[in-house]
């Protein structure tokens, strides 16, 4: 198989250094993670609701959705803990077609995973900054988790990936 090397992806630490999570935002995420842990372990009687669009491929409409969801989440906080879905990968059974924001952050340009990884990190960082939500994402590529581990509160393994040994070992 012939491949053309275009450029090296940054290592996760490089990207985290370029786009850091502030101490204040890290505290917000830690608090949310602790609440999720309490729900999963039964220490909290709250329901956990992971909700959102199938694909987060257009930033502004998703941010508008998150702002509205923030109001709803605040209204039900005593009974329901909400984690928004901000799914940036689109698994494809046939392997072709649009594969999500991580592959093609600008639909008017050619796919570019280098730009995509940075765009996804910025997207999750913006969600946390502007709404206080640490989100859920389906990581089609388990190794990408290291780019977003300080931002995500929930990571999903999708239906097309459950039989993949790499995903199962990562989970």
What is each of the regions a protein language model found here?
Residues 2-43:
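N- or domain-start disorder-to-order transition segments that initiate the globular core
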């Amino acid at each position: 198989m012939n491949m053309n090397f275009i450029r090296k992806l940054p290592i996760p630490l490089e990207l985290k250094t370029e786009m850091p999570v502030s101490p204040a935002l890290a505290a917000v995420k830690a608090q949310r993670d602790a609440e999720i842990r309490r729900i999963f372990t039964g220490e909290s009687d709250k329901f956990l609701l992971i909700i959102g669009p199938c694909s987060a491929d257009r930033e502004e409409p998703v941010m508008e959705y998150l702002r509205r969801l923030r109001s709803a989440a605040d209204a039900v906080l005593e009974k329901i803990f909400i984690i928004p879905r901000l799914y940036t990968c689109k698994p494809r059974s046939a392997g072709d077609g649009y594969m999500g924001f991580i592959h093609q952050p600008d639909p008017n340009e050619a796919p570019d995973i280098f730009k995509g990884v940075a765009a996804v990190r910025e997207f999750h960082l913006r969600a946390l900054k502007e709404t206080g939500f640490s989100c859920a994402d389906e990581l089609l590529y388990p190794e990408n988790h290291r780019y977003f581990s300080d931002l995500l509160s929930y990571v999903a393994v999708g239906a097309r990936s459950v039989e993949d040994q790499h995903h199962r070992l990562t989970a």
